[in-house]
Amino acid sequence: MAQAVAAYEKVWRDYLSNKCNLAERQAIAHLQSLAALDAAERTADTHVTEADFAYIAGATRGNDVQLLERALKAYGQHLNLIPFNTNARRMMAETYMRLRRYEEAFDVFDELLNMLSDFKEDEIGELEIAPFRLRHDADQLELLLGCGDIKIGMADSMTDAIRFFRELADDLDRGAVRVDTDSVSQRIRRTRVKSLPAEAQARLYLHGYNRLPPLKGLGVGARSLHGLCDRAFWVEKDPLAHHPKAVWADIAEKYVSERLVVVDEFLSADALEELRRFVARAPIFRTMRAGFLGSFPADGATHVVIRKLAESLRERLPSLLDKQPLGLWWFFKYTDEAPNGIGIHADPAAVNINIWLTPDEARVRGGGLTVFKRVADDRSAVADYNHEFASEEAEMVLRQQLEEGGSVHVEYRANRAVIFISDQFHVSEPFEFKRGYENHRVNLTLLFGDRLATSQAGVAEAPHAAARDTSADDLFG
């Protein structure tokens, strides 16, 4: 058994370290062994192991449909036996994404949101907490109350939650609440709920921390936040229809020659306003970073506009995206605690599209993006080039090395999209936005394809190959 576990972990490790050929060979060999098992020998563990190997083999073979379909079948068999395995459910959603079965993937992510929100009181201790998150959630609940989105009869309990979240945030800031310092990181500005006194933990659970609030249209057992959007309306809309066809040919050509393209007025006006409304009102910002909040697919970032955007982009940029499905996306919302934005990093994908959503009127200064010409080493694992730095000094050392290779700076502008090679290092420009919940800087990032998939990506191969000429191999030992 120990040998089987070690073999399984090695395949994943090789895959995540971009040793794709090695991971593929091992995954196929293990799949052949699993195929020899008869029905009586198959268990929940063998089903999920088969699913993972089929997923890895399918991904490394350019999203091979037969292998990915095999993965879906095996994930389904596993979940029939162990329905609450959130990791298996997440992998099922990611498999659907590789097959471009986006609607089914979004439904599975919605199921994950429901499962992850339905936790017991003794499980709250493992959640992260920070004053900026508490203030954000209080402000959002206040907005939802004012908009009439909270169910009738629940206003008083939500008002109590708002008051408690703000009081606890203030207490944490001034040190009035005892916190287990072993669980605290000043650099990342957050801690675990379990580091708080038992009374505070109990009150957080009572007031629904990190759970879905009682929204109208979100009934018992509801699987998503679709009540906050008109899904039927947006399914029929194209968020890019306002651009003439010639624009997309220019974008594709410029991407090949310059490796970075800026597109203004990217989303249609109604799609932009819909996403702004969604990020303001939807309780989806459940992931924390150093002073800012993230919303990923399993957090509820599954508005149908995102799916329609992915489909529309493939139609308009086939040379870039025909073989590069949407793999991951997120919203980042920067509170007043994060005036520096996100630190230097690269993202594990082929094509990155970053879209700024917050109106220009909210911006005082800064907020743009610097994209360095160097890319992450092919041999590096994701954690090597996408992580929170232990200190400002460590980040500055990397920045100085990257600047030697050159960079491009893009100024902030609402509804501006920046399209670039995803594993080029990039960093936010420090900024100041007006204070207030409605003025938080928000961006939507879409990642398409795999880092090493560009050999299958037609015209997109050329700029990525050029980027490799200035690889950051020397930045990581």
Model feature map: region roles:
Residues 14, 54, 61-62, 96:
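Residue at a conserved register position within TPR or TPR-like alpha-solenoid repeats
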Residues 30, 34-36, 77-78, 111-112:
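Canonical positions in the second alpha-helix
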Residues 39-41, 83, 117:
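Short coil turns that delineate tetratricopeptide repeat
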Residues 198, 222-324, 328-339:
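Non-heme Fe(II)/2-oxoglutarate
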Residues 323-328, 332-477:
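Catalytic core of non-heme Fe(II) oxygenases with the double-stranded beta-helix
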